[in-house]
């Protein structure tokens, strides 16, 4: 769950907006006690990118096949090959967290009102609104979805 550990943590322990009420996120259930402790004890603000945000924004096969050829072993291309292959669209769960952590004030995402996250014994997460809560969840409008998709295609294939 390591993310951008500055004054604010941006990560992607998932499914807080309750759009997928019975989704159990892998990064939560793989170490349930750690996830529960993390949300109960983390001392600084958290901005999390929920499962539903990364699910909406896809990396296209054309981008994965054509835009990462400028290096022999592009790490993103390798990850996509290992996960589902290059013939399938790929969700961008990790990339949404990275984009927010790197460019939080550029309007790529909205954020929810503050709240607290609970993680139950099955690994289901819930955000309960609370004015002094330390967790906010990324939100995504239709316009932001298009903008983030385009940004990913440009940034992930940019030659250094």
Would you name each region that the model predicts?
Residues 1-160:
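N-terminal acidic, glycine/proline-rich low-complexity segments
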């Amino acid at each position: 769950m390591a993310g951008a550990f500055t004054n604010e943590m941006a990560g992607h322990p998932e499914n807080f907006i309750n759009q997928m009420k019975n989704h159990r996120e892998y990064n939560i259930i793989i170490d349930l006690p750690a996830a529960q402790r993390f949300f109960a004890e983390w001392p600084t603000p958290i901005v999390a990118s929920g499962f539903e945000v990364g699910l909406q924004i896809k990396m296209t096969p054309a981008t994965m096949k054509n835009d990462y050829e400028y290096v022999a072993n592009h790490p993103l291309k390798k990850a996509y090959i290992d996960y589902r292959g290059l013939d399938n669209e790929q969700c961008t769960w990790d990339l949404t967290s990275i984009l927010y952590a790197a460019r939080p004030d550029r309007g790529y995402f909205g954020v929810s009102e503050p709240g607290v996250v609970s993680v139950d014994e099955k690994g289901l997460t819930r955000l309960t609104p609370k004015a002094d809560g330390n967790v906010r969840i990324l939100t995504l409008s239709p316009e932001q979805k298009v903008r983030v998709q385009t940004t990913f295609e440009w940034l992930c294939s940019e030659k250094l």
